[in-house]
């Protein structure tokens, strides 16, 4: 797995900080945590390391071949990535990977990632809040992901309410900063 991690880390170079290798590591761990019985967990975890790298699919295929991964299995790994990234996964593996990615966009980590990406792209607080609201509403498919998402969504809603309250307070103080 170390070679897979090293390869995945190289694939992430130059990405915005919200989509760096630590994002991939969290997704891989979440895949293990939420995969229901009957899902090939090892396949989904392997697919997690190639999440967001479909533009380099040929390179990923060659890497898997060098590792000795059978072509049929490599195709299933890449199909799970494709399915998850379609936004409407159909396969059990695609649903697990999709859900893990959604979970990483929820809760405290999701808020931190949203502001990190927005700062990187010079977006406003209001634009970041819009993105966070969109993330709160994303669907998850697996039972364990639904349980985990509920708590993370509650936290995000509380955070947004609090942030909106503080921003309104600041605006009501005649344009002066809140002290």
Model regions: which residues?
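Divalent metal-dependent phosphate-bond-processing catalytic cores, especially two-metal-ion Mg2+/Mn2+ enzymes
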Residues: 10-38, 50, 88-179
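Short alpha-helical hairpin
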Residues: 1-10
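An active-site-proximal "capping" alpha-helix that borders the catalytic cofactor pocket
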Residues: 27, 32, 56-67
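His-Asp-centered metal-binding catalytic motifs of divalent-metal-dependent phosphohydrolases/nucleases
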Residues: 40-60, 77-87
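Short, well-structured alpha-helical segments
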Residues: 5, 21-28, 41, 45, ...
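Short, structured loop/turn "capping" segments at alpha-beta junctions
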Residues: 71-74, 88-90
């Amino acid at each position: 797995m170390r070679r897979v991690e090293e390869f995945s880390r190289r694939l992430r170079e130059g990405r915005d900080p919200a989509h760096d290798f630590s994002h991939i590591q969290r997704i891989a761990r979440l895949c293990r945590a939420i995969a229901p019985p009957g899902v090939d967990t090892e396949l989904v975890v392997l697919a997690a390391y190639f999440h967001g790298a479909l533009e380099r699919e040929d390179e990923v295929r060659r890497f898997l071949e060098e590792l000795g991964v059978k072509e049929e299995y490599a195709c299933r790994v890449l199909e799970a990535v494709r399915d998850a990234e379609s936004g409407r996964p159909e396969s059990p593996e695609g649903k697990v990977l999709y859900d893990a990615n959604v979970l990483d966009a929820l809760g405290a980590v999701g808020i931190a990632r949203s502001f990190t990406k927005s700062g990187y792209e010079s977006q406003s607080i209001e634009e970041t809040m819009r993105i966070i609201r969109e993330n709160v509403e994303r669907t998850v498919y697996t039972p364990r992901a639904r349980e985990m998402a509920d708590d993370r969504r509650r936290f995000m809603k509380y955070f947004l309410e609090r942030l909106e309250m503080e921003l309104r307070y600041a605006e009501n103080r005649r344009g002066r900063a809140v002290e």
